[in-house]
């Protein structure tokens, strides 16, 4: 589980000075000092190719506009997770899900994020 990797993520963040995002059923973002968990997403996200690569690109975009690397990591987990939930509601099969995920990420609104985000600071 992603919780099993949390200590290693904290150590890596402290060692590098970067934020680390560990994905799974629960996503964990840490800067080594603070840990934030998010519980958005859908299991289908692990069954299609390219979600991790897309998260890397989204992290870079969030880092460009976020006040901290930790905030960028949390934003990435929440945005991609919510898009995954919405995509599965529209397209429950893997082929169409992959396309819907991109479409939902594109059309994600601030209202969607406010209504659906599940964030907990640990």
Regions found by a protein language model. Give the residues of each.
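Electropositive phosphate-/nucleotide-binding environments in soluble metabolic enzymes
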Residues: 3-6, 53, 70, 74, ...
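Structural motif
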Residues: 18-21, 27, 35-37, 56, ...
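Glycine/charged-rich beta-loop-alpha catalytic/anionic-binding loops adjacent to active sites
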Residues: 33-45
């Amino acid at each position: 589980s992603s919780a099993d990797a949390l200590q290693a993520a904290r150590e890596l963040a402290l060692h590098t000075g970067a934020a680390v995002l560990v994905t799974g059923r629960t996503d964990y973002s840490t800067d080594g000092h603070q840990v934030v968990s998010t519980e958005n997403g859908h299991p289908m996200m692990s069954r299609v190719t390219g979600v991790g690569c897309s998260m890397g690109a989204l992290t870079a975009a969030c880092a460009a506009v976020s006040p901290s690397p930790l905030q960028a990591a949390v934003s990435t987990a929440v945005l991609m997770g919510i898009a995954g939930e919405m995509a599965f509601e529209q397209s429950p099969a893997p082929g169409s899900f992959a396309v819907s995920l991109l479409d939902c990420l594109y059309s994600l609104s601030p209202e969607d994020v406010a209504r659906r985000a599940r964030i907990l600071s640990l």
